[in-house]
Amino acid sequence: LVGRRDVIAACKKLRTQIDFGKFIPEQKAAIAAMTGPLEPIKAQCAEYQRRRDALCGGFRSIGWDVPDSHGSMFVWAPVPQGHGTSMEFCMEMIEKAGVICTPGSSFGPSGEGYVRFALTLPVKKITEAVQAVKNSGLIG
């Protein structure tokens, strides 16, 4: 590349973002994450496991066979028999239990027949949600 020094310098900066790999701050963040302490990561993983166990185990205890999720902060649950589409079931969950889930159909045709829960709330709130579903009579 031939030209004014300031233009060449700007082109070099731009080029690093086009075809020479990841943005430098992203690389530095990745290095920090991979070389930093593991305790915060382990603690967060343990918290997601507690939330997953509260949701999936709670639903199984009331008769809804929801498999454990592994490696994700989301749980995919089959729509129980007799509740129509994933969208219809989500509406029933909101109206009858006050619990929000996402219809699987939002993710394309392969998602139909499932609903998705996010493990973003504390265990206490998840336990309350399971109890609300139980009290609603939707399952069983």
Predicted regions and their residues:
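PLP-dependent class I/II
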Residues: 1-140
